[in-house]
């Protein structure tokens, strides 16, 4: 049986400078600043800016000390995606089911509370250093999560027509694609949607293999790529070398008018 996932909840990036990243996503992509956590809200060791456009929620998080785990992550990988958070009915059940089926725990279930209600969260590990956090928020009406305060952009956001997250692509090592596809099938109950081989996706110089897995309602889609032989280094191999591990290659977002958006 699949782990019941309703949709994406948010995507969290670990970055070197959260404020500058937030300004970039607001200015270039028209995201709206909706929430904040940092020293001003009582969080001493890290700072997070929460941005939204349509149904897409991005969290940009930076460390405030060089010893912090987030600083280590940024030092090794550069800016990148740490958490692909999934919106669920029952975070504890989703977590327990995943663990029983062989997933590795990243964060045991916690309940966060403030004047807006409660949110339950738990997380498992996937490829590279990436996490999936299960977020149960049916009893919450705050701006984002307990611990965050509502914020507004200093200047009005100019949305560019981004509507929702279509898919999130993972790049994994040669020979690891089937292992991670099996992980999503066995642990999360995802279905294999489509397979691309190097004949489908290649240029004269670079090639890749890809399999796409999807949850029950089709809202959450994860293509998993691995390198394939080409005349030159595969773009997937190139990513693995630069990022120093498997990780999220790109996030695809939907728009009704791609020319206007671009």
Q: How should each PLM-predicted stretch be described?
A:
Residues 1-19, 81-84, 141-181, 191, ...:
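N-terminal beta-strand motif that seeds the catalytic metal site of vicinal oxygen chelate
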Residues 3-57, 100, 109-115, 123-126, ...:
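Core segments of cupin and vicinal oxygen chelate
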Residues 23, 95-96, 132-135, 142-144, ...:
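Short helix/loop capping segments that flank catalytic or ligand/cofactor-binding pockets
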Residues 33-47, 64-88, 92-121, 152-160, ...:
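A cross-kingdom feature marking solvent-exposed beta-strand/loop segments within repeated
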Residues 49-68, 136-151:
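Conserved oxyanion/phosphate-binding beta-strand-loop segments in alpha/beta enzyme cores
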Residues 113-156:
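Internal, well-ordered alpha/beta segment that forms a basic, Gly-enriched binding/recognition surface
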Residues 136, 169-174, 196, 226:
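Short, structured patches in soluble enzyme cores that scaffold and shape functional sites
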């Amino acid at each position: 049986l699949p782990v019941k996932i309703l949709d994406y909840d948010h995507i969290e990036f670990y970055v070197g400078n959260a404020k500058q990243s937030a300004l970039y996503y607001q200015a270039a992509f028209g995201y709206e600043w909706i929430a904040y956590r940092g020293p001003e809200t009582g969080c001493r060791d890290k700072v997070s800016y929460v941005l939204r456009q349509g149904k897409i929620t991005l969290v940009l998080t930076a460390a405030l000390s060089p010893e912090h785990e987030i600083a280590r992550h940024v030092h090794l990988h550069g800016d990148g995606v740490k958490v692909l958070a999934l919106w669920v009915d029952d975070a504890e059940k989703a977590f327990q089911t995943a663990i029983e089926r062989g997933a590795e725990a990243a964060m045991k279930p916690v309940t966060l509370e403030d004047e807006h209600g409660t949110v339950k969260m738990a997380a498992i590990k996937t490829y590279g250093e990436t996490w999936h956090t299960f977020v149960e928020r049916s009893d919450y009406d705050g701006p984002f999560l307990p611990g965050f305060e509502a914020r507004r952009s200093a200047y009005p956001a100019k949305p560019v027509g981004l509507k929702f997250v279509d898919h999130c692509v993972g790049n994994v090592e040669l020979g690891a694609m089937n292992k991670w596809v099996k992980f999503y099938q066995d642990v999360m109950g995802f279905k294999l949607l489509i397979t691309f081989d190097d004949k489908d996706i290649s240029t004269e110089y670079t090639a890749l293999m890809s399999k796409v897995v999807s949850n029950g309602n089709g809202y959450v889609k994860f293509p998993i790529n691995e390198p394939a032989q080409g005349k030159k280094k595969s773009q997937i191999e190139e990513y693995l070398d630069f990022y120093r591990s498997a990780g999220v290659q790109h996030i695809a977002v939907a728009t009704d008018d791609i020319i206007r958006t671009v």
